[in-house]
């Protein structure tokens, strides 16, 4: 027997009513018991009211969930900072095309960075003394952006004056006084900058043909660390690689080295500027790492701080291979071993040309009379551990002979063990014969 279906709108009490009453009830028109809820846009009905008990329960549940999240992420000991209310006119659209990041104080920024950023760098005195033995005792004078710009302007002015006097005798064009006034004002802003928007006149510097001359007017050596980060972000994004290399080498690198030398640590904003500069890895290697190694005066502290950027960031293999080839061929300093070891630890598939250059780099110390630092032996151990299967038989034998000439009591046995257990790349696999 099919299931009985109640009539639409009929109550439960009418299910077993007499047939005559059911027929009469079906013909009659009854008002529906369901009330239709209208949308809130009509404005005819009052808004729903949440009672105090329900409000307390909602707040209690939200507080419990927040405490669980803070306990899970390890931030339960820090009280939440209430958000300040701001009044905005119009839609929330930025006034210009690019939004500048606002940086907190150094303590808050270092706390946000987590354990990856170390404010204080611990340096082993013995390693520092060993590296100083291989430093350049008569380093060349460091050239700043001001020196380069003044030389360039003098040469350009002499050249243009000669050409113009020969052609038409017109005077050399100089910067408009209004331009000088604007960028002197930019200089004042950058010397006190902490956070917020940057002047638009500064943002357009990368698009100018004489951007180095304009940049010299703003006096980069007087910028704050936060201004240096913002400038690096702008120039790394808008300059070509060759121009970005000049900015890194003439502006960013001297500022980083001066900050480390003065405070024995690196400002957090300058550290983030070094990371942001890796947006153009070719310019980063040519403008920061290679000049740092070629100077011959790179300290252990500088090598550790700059090397941490290599460890944390992803770098294309071609740029890293070219940098390793360049470092292996230049005159040795203790910092070279640190950078080579960090690049080897990234486990790239290196070309044989780079591996051969690295092996030749180590074999050049067979006649070295000075005691080699531990960093040199660690770099050799890393090379053997990562690429022992890519070494040729002659290279393997030459490295074993090198260990006899330049031994280390702890590391040399480990290096020898790795070399003896490796199968050279030029040894063909012998097929197994089945009897």
Curated annotation (Swiss-Prot):
Localization annotation: Cytoplasm; Nucleus, Nucleolus
Any Pfam family hit: Bystin
Single GO cellular component term: cytoplasm
Phosphothreonine modification, residue list: 154
GO biological process, one term: stem cell proliferation
Quaternary structure, from the entry: Binds trophinin, tastin and cytokeratins.
Protein name as catalogued: Bystin
Species of provenance: Bos taurus (Bovine)
Gene: BYSL
